[in-house]
A protein has these predicted regions:
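Alpha-helical transmembrane segments of multi-pass membrane proteins predominantly involved
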Residues: 1-428
Length: 428
């Protein structure tokens, strides 16, 4: 039986119907609509979607329950939280695309692909089955491959799309191989049953369980931008259309964390691993590489790309210390939501700069406050939030993260690094 009124089904209907309708409208209209026309349709669908999820979430109407008889999707608060974060990013992306797509070709296809990618992200958040999760993963990935290279006349954009596609295909192959091993061990693709099977592995099967978890960490780590799976990220962010960079940096990254929390964390607990040490090492590597590389950049887009890598490390720190501090997981979830808003807003400001001035070099954006005061103000606020300056939202989530790290005895010196490159941008 299908619960047609469940959150993921309603979202798929709203976004799917709208996403398919936009190209159809474009074909049957005698006068082709502008980017504003199609963007408004996409924006309305996203607003209705996030309004529905927010109402369900805050009215306590969500009771964890299977949607299909096969238990492949579940309507729960975890999925709704990530759905809200992803829908916020998609809304920011669409709003930022109004000016960027003005006078550009194929706006109907562009906005339709954004909605289809959003469906994939939502499916990932609500999935409780490995097959459904992978379907959502590919539904998110394939539209973003096209969107990354949407500016076909720009060779940098073409290069970005090719790199993103090649690394994305490799990560998908790694994920499906890890899932295949998990299915071979458990005899089921249901995540709950897989975890139960992992919990009772004997010594002979334990290496296979470790291999499955390791491959899933590597595959999902690609989208999350974790070191050493981050090599594609700076070039792809630099070459993609700036609004799409916001979707990649703030949206698909969160989908990666949603998948990781659904599978990897519970899987490592079932294997009785000292998984906190492994995740902590990856988190420290990610923070270090991301922040140091960001300081060295002279291109605003690449700097924000490496900043995204660093913030992925912060989120992972909270997850890794969750067993030792009650605030760890809460802080990570709070920072996931904050980062979605902060990074999305920053890249939309960059989109405005690129559209109006066609520059991203740090030396050339000096005096931006005089030329584009509103855009400059939005960029400064988002960057200060990313740096964790009080009383902005980034400060409170970082305070929770590093407070929980102190409780767990972890190092917190890496919080200083982001301020160095952030203030390079906003200095007069």
């Amino acid at each position: 039986m299908i619960e047609i009124t469940s959150t993921p089904i309603v979202l798929m209907i709203i976004l799917g119907v709208t996403g398919m309708a936009i190209p159809v409208i474009n074909v049957i209209r005698k006068e082709k609509g502008s980017s504003t026309f199609y963007g408004t349709i996409a924006f309305a669908a996203l607003i209705i979607s996030i309004g529905f999820v927010a109402y369900q979430f805050y009215s306590d109407s969500i009771a964890p329950a299977a949607i299909f008889s096969a238990d492949v999707l579940v309507d729960d608060a975890f999925g709704s939280f990530f759905a809200i974060a992803m829908l916020i990013v998609s809304i920011i992306t669409v709003v930022g695309s109004f000016s960027y797509m003005k006078n550009r070709a194929n706006p109907a296809v562009y906005f339709s692909l954004i909605l289809l990618a959003t469906i994939g992200m939502v499916l990932i958040a609500f999935s409780t089955d490995l097959v459904m999760l992978f379907v959502g993963w590919e539904l998110m990935s394939i539209p973003t491959y096209i969107l990354a290279g949407f500016n076909k006349k720009n060779p940098i954009s073409n290069e970005a799309a090719i790199k993103y596609f090649l690394f994305g295909a490799m990560s998908s192959a790694i994920i499906i191989y890890g899932m295949s091993i998990a299915y071979g061990i458990a005899g089921s693709t249901n995540i709950g049953e897989v975890i139960q099977a992992f919990a009772v592995l004997d010594a002979e099967m334990l290496p296979l369980g470790l291999l499955a978890v390791g491959m899933l960490i590597a595959g999902f780590g690609f989208k999350m931008g974790l070191v050493p799976f981050h090599m594609w990220l700076p070039d792809t962010y630099e070459g993609s259309p700036p609004p799409i960079t916001a979707l990649l940096a703030a949206g698909t990254k969160k989908a990666g964390f949603a998948a990781a929390l659904r599978i990897i964390i519970l899987g490592t607990i079932a294997l009785n691993l000292d998984w906190t040490l492994a995740l902590g090492v990856i988190a420290i590597m990610t923070m270090t590489v991301g922040n140091i590389a960001a300081i060295m950049q002279k291109n605003l887009t690449r700097m924000l790309a490496y900043s995204s890598i660093g913030h992925a490390g912060y989120i992972l720190i909270g997850i890794s210390i969750a067993p030792f501090s009650g605030l760890g997981l809460q802080a990570s979830l709070f920072h996931i939501l904050n980062h979605a808003v902060m990074k999305g807003a920053a890249f939309i400001a960059v989109a405005g700069i690129v559209t109006t001035l066609a520059i991203t070099h740090l030396d050339k954006i000096k005096g931006l406050g005089r030329r584009m005061p509103i855009t400059a103000l939005g960029l400064v606020i988002s960057l200060l939030a990313l740096a964790g300056v009080p009383p902005l939202n980034g400060f409170w989530s970082k305070l929770m993260l590093f407070g929980s790290a102190i409780d767990a005895g972890s190092l917190t010196r890496f919080s200083v690094s982001p301020s160095k490159y952030i203030f390079r941008i906003i200095q007069p």
